[in-house]
Amino acid sequence: MPTACVAHAGSAAWERLPEALALLRPRFGRVPVYPAGDPGDAETLAAELAAEVDVLVVFGGDGTVHEVANGLPLGGDGPLVALLPAGTGNDLARALGLPPDPVAAATELAGARPRALDLLDCGPRRAANGVNAGFAAAATDVLSRPVKKALGPAAYLVGGLRAGVNPPTWPARVEVDGRVVEGEALAVVVGNGGSFGGGRWLIPDADVGDGLLDVLVVPAGVSKARLARHLARDRRLPGDLPRLRGPAATVVTDMPCRLDGEPFPTPGSVTVLPGAWRVLAPA
């Protein structure tokens, strides 16, 4: 079957791409590589290749996956996507049960099966893994690209420590299926997947294919030390924080925001696009 690979040329794992593709060759044959070097390249390549290939291998992190998800046609009409995690966070890959390493993931993909996944409609953009606003986004904003590349997932811990000295709060109002959470908040997270910031399971019950989004609100009054302890010990947040679930959410806040780790104005509404694309996942 015709297959191509869109690959983030700036990935710290670039030299491992040939080894990963060699492991996929028995299933997909020869896989030509299309490097994506500049912002927007992966999205453009995905749109151009969508009608030419049956399988699109994506080598990169959540930002590359984000671009590909925005370049492909909706409704499962595009190619089957195979993820080779090669970024800092690799959170969508984690949500699928793939190891955050391109060669190890390629081994898993050899026997993986297609799975219909949801996307989140955030207005002009779609999110593959989720939306994080407030403290979670600020932790990423303090990181430079070289720091992320050098430290890998540990960069998010460094960012969290730097942003968390005196974290600001913002007024926020979130509504899902008639349920409303309103007040000063540290963060609002809207998840398709549950992992954020390189394997921190902020919404562990989220399912990327259930047709629902999951919302976590971190109120301003919660103990910062308690949050830090939970994230350091369990890589999760306390279970008693406000959580909502439904097919759509309305979010009113001025928090800084990121979609799949990429800067973006906080969307006023987020709606699930059920079964919007097909991705290989471990059986």
Regions found by a protein language model. Give the residues of each.
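Catalytic core of DAGKc-family lipid kinases
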Residues: 4-5, 12, 18, 34-36, ...
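Glycine-rich beta-strand-to-loop/alpha-helix junction loops that act as flexible
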Residues: 9, 59-61, 84-86, 192
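Gly/Ser/Thr-rich active-site loops/lids in small-molecule metabolic enzymes
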Residues: 145-155, 196-225
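ATP/NTP phosphate-donor binding region
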Residues: 1-59, 66
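Short Gly/Thr/Asp-enriched flexible loops that form oxyanion-binding sites at enzyme active sites
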Residues: 64-76
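ATP/nucleoside-binding phosphotransfer catalytic cores, i.e., glycine-rich phosphate-binding loops
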Residues: 176, 180-182, 207, 217-283
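Glycine-rich phosphate/pyrophosphate-binding beta-alpha loops
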Residues: 132, 136, 189-204, 263
